[in-house]
């Protein structure tokens, strides 16, 4: 007998955590996605604009600048963390720079722009809130930065920045959280006035979103809680935004040092596959999005606190210890693809959990336990506490094991993966097991009902109707439909025959194009006996999962804290892995010395593209930072590098910058040895930031970068300058460069400077000579063959293009007064005629000839050509065209050809 199963056993063992499946069955699932009216990114509000807002993923940033004070706070909905300045950032012009090269008006704007750019880049907000009274130049800068990262900029009324009472009503768990909150509130009238206003604005903004979300009747099916104004649901912790112990990098430096990727790998050769275009790519061996966010934060914010930096060194040193080699390898494997605890906890809280969610919970717990055991096996030093000590001593491993035991006891992951639905283990709940047993035997029960119905119809229908009726097995069935219960189905072909049955007492429920669905006495008995078995199973499973979910959420603070530790450990494992693979060395940091000593340093990125990279050393010893008379003590803080084109000057420049940078993010460095005075800023004039929307000339953009670097630099800074002065007059460019070098060499608070230049005229007597105090001269070494004349630019034969000069890519002390630009142009394929003419002009200049006069003299070849052309002109002028009126055009053409012979 055939049965029409609308809901079969395989189809109904569904994932009750899946919202769509439950909606299909008539359940109501909370949808926390809301929409709200906010203004666009113009200075005028547009209340008709509607944006969606994800309460689990948004990052809201609020910035205010008032009375010379900058305040900032950030609410991360993903991690449920509120971050704020521990005190307002005060713009103090007297401490910005000791140099008199920049107007005071530009100092504060550069300082604020630099800080705002770093904050926005690090936070990567999705929404940025600013007050309507914000100064135009700050608003324009923030808008530009927000546009770059596709962040929505929203103007807020001033009254929202006075909602301090919202922060006072905030209740946070944990001693640290409450301490920070009380500290911010207690200093609200003194040091955190502007920052506290930004926090109030963020809370007021969330309050408005909650009210809108509540008005749309969005609810949470599992937790039964409305979003409303419950800040405790979105803020689980509060942290300081620390801007004091960080090295400052501006966007020019980040671009020049290739901190983040700006290009994609092209090609399939081994060199391209193994090479890295950015520091982020070099260390991006992490698997979770949250770990990637922390890595980005670390890269944007190198440290200046020696103790914190050396704590990271100690972890790398421990991981690379030969005694820990096997454990290090196992740790690197175990931590891969470790799920993000913030993600699955948000899904559990919002009622959006699926099989994937619970799989991540189990995977996180399994990997977390395995990593704890591996870390506990490491041979740790007795130095101060670090992440490894925190994992070993502060993580409650018994709680993790208990959570894992409960999850594995409740959920049958093997069956769930096979059926692609969430399945509860047998034995968890006797009531659920009993309902499942009934459900699994429904096919037999319904088969019996269908047979009984067929027999009933055969016995009650008139004899003549029975003869005309086809096989009842194909026309009569029994089915179960959730919520409707048990039904008898009859083919619509049999409807006329049913009219002949007296006192049938069947109730039609609904019909389709092929069947009619009835309730009769037999199926009513099933309704009474078994009820809505599918709904009962769903209810029991929801109840079980809700109980499990609550048990996991009670541990959310411990799980998220451990998640942060694991993410930071994964980054340090990446640092250690790169350091081991590429033979990096642990640098020595000093706090009070203006020193940059690098022995056999290498470029962290360029060496990934080369089989053999040629190392170079650097030595800057500028005495103590506090020494105002450093230049009188035979110390040097400035290096000027000269040399041939394409000889490696720019690479050497960025190589030193990257080594200092890597040292202060807490990683080992690509060098044999390094001793580095901690830098508070790395500032650059290397790459001209030209874009379509910037209409300034390249020299103007270069000068803006140079001015910004000089205005922000302190005695602890590092400035990298690559060929400043090009792109303008041949006198103005060298004059500006030389003036900057001389002025800085006399400054009491001169930063460390490494500069490259091709202005060889500066190294003549009484300008940038080797005798000037405070300046050291380096040059790139080259090997010149005997065929190459140092006094005259040699001609490179067509068959010997690669002969003459060999670039050694080695830096040594001294001054190079030749750039060999013509040779480089020849090797690069520039036209031979152009190169030969350039060589000729170069020889004239080197001999001291008058180039203008020489260019006015004609060669013998040119004189012969001139005389020939002169004869042609004379012949043409003596030609009497009046005599040619009857000459055909063809004959005229022939005569003209004769003139030109």
Swiss-Prot record:
Keywords: ATP-binding, DNA damage, DNA repair, DNA-binding, Nucleotide-binding. This is MutS protein homolog 5. InterPro entries: DNA_mismatch_repair_Msh2, DNA_mismatch_repair_MutS_C, DNA_mismatch_repair_MutS_core, DNA_mismatch_repair_MutS_sf, MutS, P-loop_NTPase. Involved in meiotic recombination. Facilitate crossovers between homologs during meiosis. ATP binds at residues 643-650. It comes from the Eukaryota. Heterooligomer of MSH4 and MSH5. It comes from Saccharomyces cerevisiae (strain ATCC 204508 / S288c) (Baker's yeast). Signal peptide: none annotated. Two distinct classes of crossovers have been demonstrated in budding yeast. Class I is MSH4/MSH5 dependent and exhibits crossover interference. Class II is MUS81/MMS4 dependent and exhibits no interference. Belongs to the DNA mismatch repair MutS family. PROSITE patterns: DNA_MISMATCH_REPAIR_2 (PS00486). GO terms for molecular function: ATP binding; ATP-dependent DNA damage sensor activity; mismatched DNA binding. GO terms for cellular component: DNA repair complex; MutSgamma complex; nuclear chromosome; nucleus. Pfam families: MutS_III, MutS_V. GO terms for biological process: chiasma assembly; mismatch repair; reciprocal meiotic recombination. The keyword Plastid does not apply.
């Amino acid at each position: 007998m055939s049965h029409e199963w609308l809901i079969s056993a395989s189809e109904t063992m569904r994932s009750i955590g899946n919202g769509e499946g439950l909606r299909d069955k008539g359940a109501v699932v909370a949808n926390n996605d809301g929409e709200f009216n906010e203004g666009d990114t113009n200075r005028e509000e547009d209340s008709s604009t509607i944006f969606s807002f994800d309460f689990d993923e948004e990052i809201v940033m609020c910035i205010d600048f008032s009375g010379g004070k900058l305040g900032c706070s950030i609410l991360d909905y993903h991690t449920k963390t509120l971050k704020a300045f521990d005190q307002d950032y005060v713009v103090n012009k007297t401490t910005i720079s000791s140099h008199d090269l920049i107007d005071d008006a530009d100092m504060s704007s550069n300082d604020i722009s630099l800080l705002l750019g770093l904050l926005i880049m690090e936070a990567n907000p999705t929404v940025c809130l600013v007050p309507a009274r914000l100064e135009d130049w700050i608003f324009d800068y923030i808008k530009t930065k927000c546009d770059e990262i596709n962040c929505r900029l929203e103007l807020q009324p001033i009254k929202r920045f006075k909602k301090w009472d919202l922060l006072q009503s905030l209740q946070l768990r944990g001693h640290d959280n409450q301490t920070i909150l009380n500290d911010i509130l207690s200093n609200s009238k003194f040091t955190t006035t502007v920052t506290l206003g930004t926090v109030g604005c963020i809370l007021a903004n969330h309050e408005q979103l909650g009210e809108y979300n509540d008005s749309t009747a969005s609810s949470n099916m599992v937790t039964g809680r409305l979003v409303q104004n419950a800040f405790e649901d979105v803020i689980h912790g509060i942290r300081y935004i620390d801007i004091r112990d960080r090295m400052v990098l501006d966007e020019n430096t980040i671009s020049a040092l290739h901190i983040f990727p700006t290009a994609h790998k092209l090609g399939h050769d081994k060199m391209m596959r193994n090479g890295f275009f950015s520091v982020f790519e070099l260390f991006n061996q992490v698997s979770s999005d949250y770990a990637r966010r922390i890595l980005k934060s670390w890269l944007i914010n190198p440290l200046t606190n020696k103790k914190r930096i050396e704590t990271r060194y100690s972890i790398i040193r421990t991981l690379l210890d030969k005694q820990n080699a096997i454990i290090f390898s196992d740790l690197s494997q175990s931590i891969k693809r470790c799920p993000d605890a913030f993600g699955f906890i948000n899904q559990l809280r919002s009622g959006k959990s699926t099989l994937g969610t619970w799989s991540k919970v189990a995977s996180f717990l399994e990997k977390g336990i395995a990593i704890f055991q591996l870390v506990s096996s490491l041979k740790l030093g007795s130095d101060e506490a670090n992440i490894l000590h925190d994992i070993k001593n502060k993580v409650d491993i018994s709680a993790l094991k208990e959570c894992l035991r409960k999850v594995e006891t409740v959920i049958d992951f093997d069956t769930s993966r096979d059926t692609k639905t969430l399945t509860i283990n047998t034995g968890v709940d006797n009531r659920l097991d009993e309902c499942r047993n009934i459900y699994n035997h429904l096919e037999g029960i319904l088969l019996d009902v269908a047979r009984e119905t067929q027999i009933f119809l055969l016995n009650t229908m008139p004899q003549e109707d029975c003869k005309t009726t086809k096989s009842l097995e194909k026309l009569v069935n029994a089915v179960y439909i959730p919520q409707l219960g048990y039904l008898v189905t009859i083919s619509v072909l049999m409807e006329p025959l049913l009219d002949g049955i007296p006192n049938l007492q069947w109730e039609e429920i609904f019909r389709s194009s092929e069947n009619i669905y009835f309730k009769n006495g037999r199926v009513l008995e099933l309704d009474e006996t078994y009820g809505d078995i599918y709904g009962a199973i769903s209810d029991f499973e929801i109840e079980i999962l809700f109980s499990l979910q609550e048990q996991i959420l009670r541990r959310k603070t411990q799980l998220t804290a451990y998640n942060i530790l694991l993410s930071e450990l994964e980054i340090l494992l990446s640092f250690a892995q790169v350091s081991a693979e590429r033979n990096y060395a642990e640098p020595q940091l000093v706090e009070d010395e203006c020193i940059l000593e690098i022995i056999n340093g290498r470029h962290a990125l360029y060496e990934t593209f080369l089989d053999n990279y040629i190392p170079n050393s650097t030595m800057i010893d500028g005495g103590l930072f506090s020494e105002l008379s450093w230049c009188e003590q035979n110390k040097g803080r400035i290096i000027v590098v000269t040399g041939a084109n394409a000889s490696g000057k720019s690479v050497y420049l960025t190589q030193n910058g990257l080594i200092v940078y890597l040292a202060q993010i807490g990683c080992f460095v690509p060098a044999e040895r390094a001793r580095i005075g901690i830098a508070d800023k790395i500032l650059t004039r290397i790459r001209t930031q030209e874009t379509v929307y910037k209409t300034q000339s390249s020299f103007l953009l270069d000068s803006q970068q140079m001015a910004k670097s000089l205005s922000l630099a302190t005695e602890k800074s590092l400035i990298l300058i690559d060929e400043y002065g090009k792109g303008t007059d041949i006198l103005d460019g060298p004059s500006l460069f030389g003036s900057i070098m001389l002025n800085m060499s006399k400054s009491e608070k001169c930063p460390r400077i490494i500069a490259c230049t091709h202005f060889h005229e500066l190294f003549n007597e009484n300008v940038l000579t080797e005798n000037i105090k405070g300046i050291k001269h380096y040059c790139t070494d080259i090997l010149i063959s005997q065929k190459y004349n140092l006094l005259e630019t040699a001609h490179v034969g067509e068959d010997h293009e690669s002969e003459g000069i060999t670039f050694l890519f080695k830096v040594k002390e001294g001054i190079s007064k030749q750039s060999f630009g013509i040779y480089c142009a020849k090797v690069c394929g520039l036209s031979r005629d152009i190169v030969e003419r350039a060589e000729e002009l170069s020889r004239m200049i080197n001999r001291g000839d008058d180039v203008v006069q020489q260019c006015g003299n004609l060669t013998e070849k040119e004189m012969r050509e001139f005389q020939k052309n002169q004869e042609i002109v004379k012949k043409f002028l003596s030609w009497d065209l009046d005599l040619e009126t009857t000459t055909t055009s063809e004959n005229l053409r022939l005569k003209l050809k004769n003139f030109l012979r």
